[in-house]
Amino acid sequence: MSVLGVNMSLSEKQILDMKLILVFALVIFLYISTSVRNDKRYLLANEVTFKNIEQPLITEEVVNKLLIQNKGSVKNIKKVALALNSIESVLDANPYVRNSEVYVSVNGSVGVDVLQKKPLARVQTKESYYIDEEGKKMPTSPNFAVRVPLVSGDGVESNLNNMFKLLKSIDSDSFYKKEIVEIIVSKKGKYKLLLREFDLFIDFGTTENIELKLNNFKAFYKKATKDKTINKYKYVNLQIASQVICTKI
């Protein structure tokens, strides 16, 4: 009786082990099957989110075309065929894109976060291009015009670094960002600024003491507009950092 009991006990253990193996195998099978079906699912409509886009230079339509690499609608691509890193590389190669992130949710929808480059000024010399927030050149857009200061003059190319310092200061100040419409650069690295609201010509001089000069002019501007005398002036000289020399009409 005891021998039979031992055999019965061993058989039950073997059966239990087999059941556990079958359950484990079933779990693996279901996981693999689900993954395969998930990869073969067609992607749903994507959602594009733009960042740093005060003024657009790239559209959702352009992103979609880059996203699928000219293969048609995003709905025609299976998840397994979407190489996220490759798509991000394609997007990042666009001259208006600073950085991008492409991701696919569990339900198959595609998300794209696009960080657009920010133009600080538009250069108009022998060639036309933007200067971005890193001081690098970027092409103008055939579809959009960005409202930024126009930069011209025969000293642009030889003074790009110093010009960028001035552009950064202008962009960081809401007053100057709104008011400065044109910057003329001489070969000697001297700058002339034109205002949007008033017909006032500013001889800024070099980029030494940028912040001091900008603060001095802003103080003059506030006083002259408050006194309603701003229209009496045609020319303001800021070449001497500690002075604001004005010439009346």
What is each PLM-predicted segment?
Residues 1-65, 69, 74, 187-249:
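N-terminal positively charged amphipathic segments used for targeting/anchoring
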Residues 39-128, 132-143:
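Terminal hydrophobic membrane-targeting helix
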Residues 44-46, 87, 93-98, 106-110, ...:
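Envelope-exposed proteins and targeting segments
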Residues 60, 64, 84, 88, ...:
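Extracytoplasmic/secreted envelope proteins and their assembly/folding machinery
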Residues 81, 101-103, 150-170, 203-208, ...:
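A broadly tuned preference for mixed-charge, low-complexity surface segments
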Residues 93-96, 172, 219-222, 226:
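Short, intrinsically disordered, mixed-charge
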Residues 113-187, 193, 202:
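Extracytoplasmic segments of membrane-associated envelope/inner-membrane machinery
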